[in-house]
Each structure stands twice: as structure tokens, then as C-alpha cells.
């Protein structure tokens, strides 16, 4: 089975969010399950910069190629590399006009950029003769590929047996643009209807992918159900319900080789489930590095997140003053909306011995927080899957979450009777319930140390690997092939 896996970001070539982790890991595990997978992504400026840092080579293999169907004179080149730690070939669509911004999700025109990349990807596939059985696209930036295949390429024998899979990592980002982009894309007018890409008189790229893909999945079973409701559907619940028989939920995994406290080169002291006492050495070193009072007994809670409303930060801001009444230090890492960046900076000014606000993106510090914290906070308003809680569990750091989406599928409330469970959480979206959940976690941390150690052990022994997920994706590909009569 040949799969072309298309993503706007892939770790370590370019990373902004969790999509990069998925796209940089799932293909490796698909390969282990016998799938012949090739990655295609844009050649962002950061790709060249990361080459030396992450030890990969990148070379040009074609240049000056025209883009079919799109009304543009822009050409593209093809570059090639190999995904580090694997033999997965990765091809890059290179164009200095569209992909020269420092930010992966920036550029002169995001609509044109996505259209150009989608169309160029299909030209790349034909130019390199990749002969895919499956084209697997991710999020709105790549969602027009199934639209192209089902319309302007419908009678092209090269793609006649190719099936499409769309993975929705976050329904909140849809790629909604003026209808004029339809002409630029070279797509037929008939797709701009209520049953196609039309969305409140605008053009919705993600909706196009939902309508035209053979099968669709999102990144947790709970989120697949949630997005068919008005509360979580982001005005697409109707079309998602129409495709419900082709809509699946597959939990993301994490790379157990990369995220392993026993071998992680970024953390201060390596440890494993049988040497948990070494974890506290990471806490002390983290406190030292961040200028917090050093005390291995004091509970440390970590928050590693984009600082945006989706992440439930309004709840945390509401209860920060109350949390400061506990023997608790809070370490924040992330960037995002100015209101949240400034809020956490002010909390650090107000509580310099209890709050460390690190308003930046720092992979090394993130690993140190996963290893050095006792508690990990994820009070998300919604969470398609979430990777932070998986990383934290892998490192024995106990998640306190809102039970929504993938958080509900991965974190199980600890039951002191059965001694089963991996964390703590709450369902109702309000600050009082968050405060209660954190308070409960702190009770076990300070007063039920045997139970706390059991929760850590449970968390670290939970199977959150990509191996499990990859098997489910292979099954999903078979369902997609069945849709095209294979």
C-alpha cells in the first residue's frame, strides 16, 4: 500500500504545533506496519535552518515546474530529504514567493498559498511517479487536494484508483476565504454550493475536504462524536453528521523513542518507572534554572501550551490567586494571545517565588518541565486529542484536565479504591471545577504519597504509543480503498 502523507508542518523540518509531532512520527510507524509512505510538505524557510540543528540533508531534485489548473505564473521546485530516524522520503514544494516567511503559517496570501501547495502536490506526485493508493491530507491547508482529485482530476487515469483520507486535527481552523479564490484555484463553479465548499457565502477549504474525501477521521473517538454537535461543531456539525458513517476517531500517539525519560538528552537527570526518586532531581534543577525557591517537597504544576482561548486559560487566570494560597509553584511555557501572555507575566511579577512565566517556544525547556513538574495542567475548552497530557504521563507528571475530546479518552480519574487511573479532571467548564480538581490532586500529592506514587506508575505504564495508532490508520486506509472499489 502506497501512501502520500501531506502536511504543512512536520517535525523536525518545521514545527509550530502538535500537527508537526503527528506528521513527523506517524509515517515512521506506518512504515513499520508495511505501508510505503512518502511525506510531502512546503519548503518553509525554517526547513533549511533546521537542517544542521537536526542533522538532515536536503537537496533539489527538480526545478521550474508549472502548477496545473491554478491561475498563476509561479513555478515550484522539488527538494528531497529523509525523515530523521527513519527511511521515510520527504519531498518539499519550494517557492520563494509563497513559502519565504519566518512563520510556517504566514505569507503574502494564505488562501493562495494553500491552493498553490495543494495543486503543486498533485503535480509533484505525478512528476515523481509516486503512484499513491492513498493521499492522506491534514487540516484545511491541504484539504483542497481531495476536491481537486474528485473534480478536475476525476477522469485522469493516473489517480483513478487513488483514495483520500482527511484528518481533522482541529475543527476550529477551517480556512474560510472570499469566493474569488475558486477561480484562482481553477476549480469548477459547481463546487460552490451548500453541498460543497460554500459556507455562509464564503469558501471553506476544510468543508471541501469533508465533503470530497473518501473517509475522514479526527484525532480521538470523543472528539469525533463532539464535532457532530452544535457545541463543538463550529457550524460544520451538519455536514459532519451527513458524513458520520465515514467519520472515525483515532487517538494520536507519542514517539516512545523520542519522548523517553530514561534516554531524553534534554532533561537534567534520566529516570524510569523503577527509579522515580530521580524525577525529583529534575524538579530541583528546574527550580534552580527558573529562579524559583528550591524545595523538592513543593508541588510544581506545569502548563505548556499555545496561549489561546481554546486552552481554557481564562479558567486558570480566574483561579490563579486562589492557587497561590497552596504550597504550589506554577511554570508556564508558551506564546499566543497578548492578553494571556501579559496575564502570566503579571502573575510572575505578583508572585515571583511561585510563578515562572516563560513566554516563548523552547523544546528543551518543555522537556525539562515534563520531567520536573509534578502536575500538568490542561483545562481546555475543547481538545481534539492533546499531546501534552500524553507527554506528561510518559514522564510521570500527573495531568489535571477538563474531560473533553482526547483528554477524556486518555486520562482516567484516579480511584483510590481500585488504585486505577492516571490523573484528575472535571467536566463542567468553569473555574470552580478546575480549582476543585487541582485541590484534589494536591491532596493526594501531599497527604496520600503511596497513592501518588501509584498514579505516577499507572501513568507511565499506559500505552500511548504510535504503534497502537498506526494499526488503526492501516485499517482506515483499507476502508478508504473500499470506497473506491478496491
From Swiss-Prot:
Known catalytic reactions: [(1->4)-alpha-D-glucosyl](n) + ADP-alpha-D-glucose = [(1->4)-alpha-D-glucosyl](n+1) + ADP + H(+)
Binding of ADP-alpha-D-glucose, residues: 15
GO molecular function annotations of the record: alpha-1,4-glucan glucosyltransferase (ADP-glucose donor) activity; alpha-1,4-glucan glucosyltransferase (UDP-glucose donor) activity
Keyword match Secreted: no
Pfam families for this protein: Glyco_transf_5, Glycos_transf_1
InterPro entries the record matches: Glyco_trans_1, GS/SS, Starch_synth_cat_dom
Keywords: Glycogen biosynthesis, Glycosyltransferase, Transferase
Pathway info: Glycan biosynthesis; glycogen biosynthesis
Keyword presence, Transmembrane helix: no
Described purpose of this protein according to its UniProt entry: Synthesizes alpha-1,4-glucan chains using ADP-glucose.
HAMAP family the UniProt entry points to: Glycogen_synth
Stored PANTHER family: ALPHA AMYLASE DOMAIN-CONTAINING PROTEIN, GRANULE-BOUND STARCH SYNTHASE 1, CHLOROPLASTIC/AMYLOPLASTIC
Record's protein name: Glycogen synthase
Organism field: Thermotoga petrophila (strain ATCC BAA-488 / DSM 13995 / JCM 10881 / RKU-1)
Amino acid at each position: 500500500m502506497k501512501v502520500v502523507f501531506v502536511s504543512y508542518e512536520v517535525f523536525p523540518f518545521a514545527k509550530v504545533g502538535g500537527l508537526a509531532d503527528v506528521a513527523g512520527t506517524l509515517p515512521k510507524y506506518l512504515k513499520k506496519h508495511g505501508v510505503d509512505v512518502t511525506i510531502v510538505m512546503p519548503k518553509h524557510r525554517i526547513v533549511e535552518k533546521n537542517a544542521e540543528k537536526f542533522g538532515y540533508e536536503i537537496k533539489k531534485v527538480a526545478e521550474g515546474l508549472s502548477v496545473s489548473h491554478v491561475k498563476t505564473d509561479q513555478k515550484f521546485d522539488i527538494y528531497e530529504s529523509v525523515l530523521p530516524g527513519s527511511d521515510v522520503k520527504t519531498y518539499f514544494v519550494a517557492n520563494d514567493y509563497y513559502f519565504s516567511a519566518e512563520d510556517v503559517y504566514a505569507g503574502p496570501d494564505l488562501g493562495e498559498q494553500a491552493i498553490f501547495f495543494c495543486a503543486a502536490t498533485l503535480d509533484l506526485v505525478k512528476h515523481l511517479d509516486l503512484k499513491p493508493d492513498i493521499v492522506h491530507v491534514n487540516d484545511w491547508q491541504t484539504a483542497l487536494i481531495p476536491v481537486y482529485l474528485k473534480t478536475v482530476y476525476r477522469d485522469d487515469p493516473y489517480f483513478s484508483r487513488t483514495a483520500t483520507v482527511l484528518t481533522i486535527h482541529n475543527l476550529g481552523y477551517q480556512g474560510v476565504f472570499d469566493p474569488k479564490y475558486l477561480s484562482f484555484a481553477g476549480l469548477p463553479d459547481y463546487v460552490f454550493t451548500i453541498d460543497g465548499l460554500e459556507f455562509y457565502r464564503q469558501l471553506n477549504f476544510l468543508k471541501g475536504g469533508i465533503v470530497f474525501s473518501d473517509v475522514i477521521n479526527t484525532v480521538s473517538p470523543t472528539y469525533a462524536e463532539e464535532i457532530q454537535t452544535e457545541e463543538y461543531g463550529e457550524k460544520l456539525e451538519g455536514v459532519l453528521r451527513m458524513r458520520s458513517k465515514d467519520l472515525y476517531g483515532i487517538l494520536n500517539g507519542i514517539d516512545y523513542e523520542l519522548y523517553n525519560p530514561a534516554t531524553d538528552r534534554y532533561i537534567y537527570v534520566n529516570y524510569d518507572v523503577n527509579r522515580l526518586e530521580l524525577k525529583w532531581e529534575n524538579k530541583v534543577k528546574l527550580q534552580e534554572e527558573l529562579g524559583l525557591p528550591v524545595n523538592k517537597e513543593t508541588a510544581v504544576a506545569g502548563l505548556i501550551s499555545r496561549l489561546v482561548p481554546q486552552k481554557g486559560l481564562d479558567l486558570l487566570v480566574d483561579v490563579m490567586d486562589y492557587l497561590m494560597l497552596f504550597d504550589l509553584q506554577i511554570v508556564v511555557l508558551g506564546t499566543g494571545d497578548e492578553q494571556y501572555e501579559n496575564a502570566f507575566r503579571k502573575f510572575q511579577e505578583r508572585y515571583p517565588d511561585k510563578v515562572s512565566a516563560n513566554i516563548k517556544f523552547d523544546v528543551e525547556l518543555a522537556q525539562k518541565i515534563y520531567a520536573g513538574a509534578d502536575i500538568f495542567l490542561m483545562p481546555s475548552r475543547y481538545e481534539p486529542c492533546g499531546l501534552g497530557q500524553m507527554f506528561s504521563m510518559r514522564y510521570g507528571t500527573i495531568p489535571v484536565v477538563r474531560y473533553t475530546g482526547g483528554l477524556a479518552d486518555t486520562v482516567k480519574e484516579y480511584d483510590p479504591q481500585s488504585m486505577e487511573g492516571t490523573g484528575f479532571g472535571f467536566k463542567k467548564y468553569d473555574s470552580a471545577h478546575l480549582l476543585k480538581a487541582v485541590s484534589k490532586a494536591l491532596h493526594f500529592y501531599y497527604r496520600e504519597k503511596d497513592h501518588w506514587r501509584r498514579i505516577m506508575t499507572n501513568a507511565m505504564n499506559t500505552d500511548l504509543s504510535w504503534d497502537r495508532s498506526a494499526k488503526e490508520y492501516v485499517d482506515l486506509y483499507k476502508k478508504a480503498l473500499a470506497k473506491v472499489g478496491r
